[in-house]
C-alpha cells in the first residue's frame, strides 16, 4: 500500500482519485501533481513503482502544505480571528454560520439539532 504524507492510499483506485484521500489535495491539485511528475492518471495505486511513489511523495511535500500542517494552520487562523475580536471569530465562537448565511431558518448543520422550547401556557378561567 502506497503511503504519501502519512496517509495510506487505497490500492484498487486510480492514483488521480487516491491522492484526494490526502487532506488538502482535491481533484485539481491531484491532476497538477500527476502532470508535474509525469505519472498517468489512469494508473492504479497497486501498479505504481517504488520510484514513482517516491517522486509523488517528494512533489507533494515540496509543493503543498497537507495533512497536519494544513489542519494546524487553519485552526490557528480561526483562533487568531477569535483572539482579535473579529466578527468572523465571534461567529466561530458562537457556532453560527460565518459567511453571512441566514439563521432565522436553516443553519442546522452549524447550530446542531433543534433545542425545543416550551410554548406559552394558556391561563385557565375561573
From Swiss-Prot:
SUPFAM superfamilies the record matches: S13-like H2TH domain (SSF46946)
Source superkingdom: Bacteria
A GO molecular-function descriptor: rRNA binding
GO CC, alphabetical: cytosol; small ribosomal subunit
Gene Ontology biological process terms from the UniProt entry: translation
Pfam families: Ribosomal_S13
Entry keyword annotation includes Ribosomal protein: yes
Region Disordered, annotated ranges: 92-126
Keyword annotations: Ribonucleoprotein, Ribosomal protein, RNA-binding, rRNA-binding, tRNA-binding
UniProt keyword RNA-binding present: yes
Xref: InterPro entries: Rbsml_uS13_C, Ribosomal_uS13, Ribosomal_uS13-like_H2TH, Ribosomal_uS13_bac-type, Ribosomal_uS13_CS
Gene3D superfamilies assigned: 1.10.8.50, 30s ribosomal protein s13, domain 2
Summary of the function given for this chain in its UniProt record: Located at the top of the head of the 30S subunit, it contacts several helices of the 16S rRNA. In the 70S ribosome it contacts the 23S rRNA (bridge B1a) and protein L5 of the 50S subunit (bridge B1b), connecting the 2 subunits; these bridges are implicated in subunit movement. Contacts the tRNAs in the A and P-sites.
Assembly mode: Part of the 30S ribosomal subunit. Forms a loose heterodimer with protein S19. Forms two bridges to the 50S subunit in the 70S ribosome.
UniProt record similarity statement: Belongs to the universal ribosomal protein uS13 family.
The name this protein goes by in its record: Small ribosomal subunit protein uS13
Organism of this sequence: Deinococcus deserti (strain DSM 17065 / CIP 109153 / LMG 22923 / VCD115)
Classification lineage: Bacteria, Thermotogati, Deinococcota, Deinococci, Deinococcales
Gene responsible for this protein: rpsM
